[in-house]
């Protein structure tokens, strides 16, 4: 059996480039251990049985245990058929764990059909509590993109995606003796759910820049995945988004300096999002200006963030009746209209955009070396309702960490369509609605800005 295990391990490493991190935690957990893992695919049990030391026990549904293909698997691991609704079955499993066994159980009870955590049942938490077993959380990542998952039509599945197993520090569920009955079961289940969600968060990679994450999303979901649309009904997929933002970035690079904070005074349109990513790709920091703040509010924001250049739109200024406001701001900063940039595009700019849309990792790698995850990614501003608007600097890591936290609580996938009813200068409008969507393969419609409201708000400039 050892030889078979080694052969299967070799094959899996070659095909799926399997990486195991934190194996020392397996031994730190001791002998009486309940191993819990997220359930991503039919490969999960094979991966755990092959890459974990020893011959471990697998809790398996009694109906699944009757399948013909389960029998060969039982030669590598020890199978423990369980009926999840039968109290006697659970008691038997607890007694088995008390014999200082290491056993694997999937708290979700089934393979995910959303790509994220499914409902986590209380039973495994109660088992860990009553048996006194240490809990060893293991994150399985990558198998959800394989053909062995149940995400057909939800994720872009691959034949041999890279798979990583991460073993976290062992934990133990402990409760006060005063908690009894159903409350005790529920409390144990609640702790287990927290362990699972914390596991997903702590093993997700937030040490990236926004552009790194954009390219990662393109690779996962495909260049043709539509992710952006506005009221003009001209949807953009990853390929077009990278093409247009890359051309725009060349023009902006000639007008600004690296690490400059650059103002965007724009409504909710594709052009605003393209401008945001264009600035990201050349190491500038976008500052999302609140066009309803009036002259004093905007001037304060410009001074606070030390903004020297602001990009806006002639059409937007005209519809919003902000000509007087822009004339005043133009005395303080350099106002550049996106419409004017179109006249500056050269053949080299277009060629660069095409190259970036086809080979983004190769082209962009030369530009991003100076941008780090902890560097500022965007500057937002408070409403000013309690005084002068304050600048809020968010790093790339801040934004991606918030996105990961959201993903542990909400099921979303590339088939979802998000309507962003908030302005892009709003933290939720930019990060929660727009960036979460674009960076996860979902299509976001950035809605429509109310010109009437803008004009009224700025009339006192």
Stretches with model-predicted labels:
Residues 213-238, 377-380:
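AMP-dependent adenylate-forming
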Residues 10-13, 241-247, 359, 364, ...:
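Conserved structural elements of the adenylate-forming
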Residues 251-293, 421-423:
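Conserved AMP-binding/adenylate-forming
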Residues 400-417, 425-461:
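Conserved AMP-binding/adenylation subdomain of ANL enzymes
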Residues 22, 98, 102, 115-179:
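A cross-family acyltransferase "interaction/gating" segment
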Residues 235-239, 368-370, 377-401:
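Conserved AMP-binding A3 loop
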Residues 335-381, 388, 411-417:
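Conserved pre-ATP/AMP-binding loop-to-beta segment of ANL
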Residues 254, 281-354, 461:
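Structural core segment of the AMP-binding/adenylate-forming
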């Amino acid at each position: 059996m050892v030889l078979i295990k080694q052969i299967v391990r070799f094959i899996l490493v070659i095909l799926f480039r399997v990486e195991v991190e934190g194996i020392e935690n397996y031994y730190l957990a001791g002998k009486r251990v309940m191993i819990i893992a997220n359930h991503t695919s039919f490969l999960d049990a094979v991966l755990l049985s092959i890459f974990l030391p020893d011959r471990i026990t697998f809790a398996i549904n009694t109906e699944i245990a009757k399948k013909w293909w389960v029998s060969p698997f039982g030669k590598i691991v020890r199978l423990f058929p369980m009926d999840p609704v039968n109290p006697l079955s659970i008691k038997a499993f607890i007694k088995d764990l008390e014999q200082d066994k290491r056993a694997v159980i999937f708290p979700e009870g089934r393979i995910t059909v959303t790509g994220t955590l499914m409902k986590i049942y209380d039973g495994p938490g109660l088992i860990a509590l009553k048996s006194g077993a240490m809990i060893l959380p293991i994150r399985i990542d990558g198998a959800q993109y394989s053909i062995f998952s149940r995400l057909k039509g939800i994720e872009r599945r691959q034949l041999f995606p890279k798979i990583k197993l991460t073993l976290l520090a062992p934990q133990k569920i402990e409760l006060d003796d005063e908690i009894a009955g159903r409350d005790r079961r529920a409390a144990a289940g609640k702790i287990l759910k927290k362990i699972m969600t914390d596991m997903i968060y702590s093993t997700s990679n937030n040490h990236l820049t926004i552009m790194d994450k954009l390219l990662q999303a393109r690779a996962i979901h495909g260049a043709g995945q539509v992710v952006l649309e506005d009221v003009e009904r001209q949807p953009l997929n990853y390929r077009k988004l990278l093409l247009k933002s890359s051309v725009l970035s060349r023009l902006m690079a000639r007008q600004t300096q690296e690490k400059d904070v650059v103002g965007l005074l724009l409504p909710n349109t594709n052009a605003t999002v393209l401008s945001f990513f264009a600035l990201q790709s050349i190491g500038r920091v976008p500052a999302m200006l609140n066009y309803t703040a009036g002259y004093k509010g905007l001037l304060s924001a410009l001074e606070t963030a030390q903004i020297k250049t602001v990009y806006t739109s002639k059409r937007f200024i005209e519809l919003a009746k902000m000509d007087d406001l822009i004339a005043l701001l133009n005395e303080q900063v350099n106002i550049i209209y996106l419409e004017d940039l179109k006249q500056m595009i050269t053949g080299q700019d277009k060629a660069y955009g095409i190259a970036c849309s086809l080979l983004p990792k190769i082209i962009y790698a030369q530009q991003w070396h100076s941008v780090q995850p902890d560097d500022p990614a965007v500057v937002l501003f408070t409403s000013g309702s309690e005084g002068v608007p304050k600048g809020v600097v968010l790093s790339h890591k801040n934004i991606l960490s918030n996105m990961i936290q959201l993903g542990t609580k909400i099921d979303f996938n590339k088939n979802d369509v998000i309507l962003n009813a908030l302005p892009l200068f709003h933290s939720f409008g930019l990060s929660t609605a727009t960036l979460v969507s674009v960076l996860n393969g979902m299509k976001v419609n950035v809605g429509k800005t109310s010109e009437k409201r803008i004009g009224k708000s700025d009339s006192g400039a």
